[in-house]
Swiss-Prot record:
Its EC number is 4.2.1.108. Catalyzes the circularization of gamma-N-acetyl-alpha,gamma-diaminobutyric acid (ADABA) to ectoine (1,4,5,6-tetrahydro-2-methyl-4-pyrimidine carboxylic acid), which is an excellent osmoprotectant. InterPro entries: Ectoine_synth (IPR010462), RmlC-like_jellyroll (IPR014710), RmlC_Cupin_sf (IPR011051). It comes from Aliivibrio fischeri (strain MJ11) (Vibrio fischeri). The keyword Lyase applies. It catalyses: (2S)-4-acetamido-2-aminobutanoate = L-ectoine + H2O. The gene is ectC. It is an enzyme of class 4 (lyase). CDD domains: cupin_EctC. This is L-ectoine synthase. Pathway: Amine and polyamine biosynthesis; ectoine biosynthesis; L-ectoine from L-aspartate 4-semialdehyde: step 3/3. The keyword Lyase applies. One of its GO terms (biological process) is ectoine biosynthetic process. Gene3D superfamilies: Jelly Rolls.
Length: 128
């Protein structure tokens, strides 16, 4: 059995941050569960370009509000209780509104190793 707390993961190398977000990677590839689980904070009043060419992701909004704009498609509001699933490697923009950051629970398949950040195209590489 594996037991971890958000606080202990946040205070370790499992916390990865960029200019627009931070991700606490609580479950990773080396945990051998077949997926990874993260608590990700999207900073308020930011926009992040993302395109997971190598991963599928499901995201549940726990707090805050914003929107997701699928490139070439629709824009969907995000608020607590919203689940969105990127099941087609959807290229998108993720925006948090000005008044509050968004806190999201995220699941990735295949699992990430823990050090990945978005490249210039919004992509996470596949790492061993």
């Amino acid at each position: 059995m594996i037991v971890r707390t958000l606080d202990e993961c946040r205070d370790s190398e499992r916390r990865v941050a960029s200019e627009t977000w931070e991700s606490v990677r609580m479950l990773l590839k080396n945990d051998n569960m077949g997926f990874s689980f993260h608590i990700t904070t999207i900073y308020q009043d930011t926009e992040t370009h993302i395109h997971y060419k190598n991963h599928l992701e499901s995201v549940y909004c726990m707090s805050g509000e914003g929107e997701i704009e699928v490139i070439g498609g629709e824009t969907y509001p995000i608020k607590p209780g919203t689940l969105y699933i990127l099941d087609k490697h959807d290229e998108h923009y993720l925006r948090a509104y000005k008044d509050k950051e968004m806190v999201m629970a995220c699941v990735f398949n295949p699992p990430i190793t823990g050090t990945e950040v978005h490249d210039e195209n919004g992509v996470y590489p596949v790492l061993d």
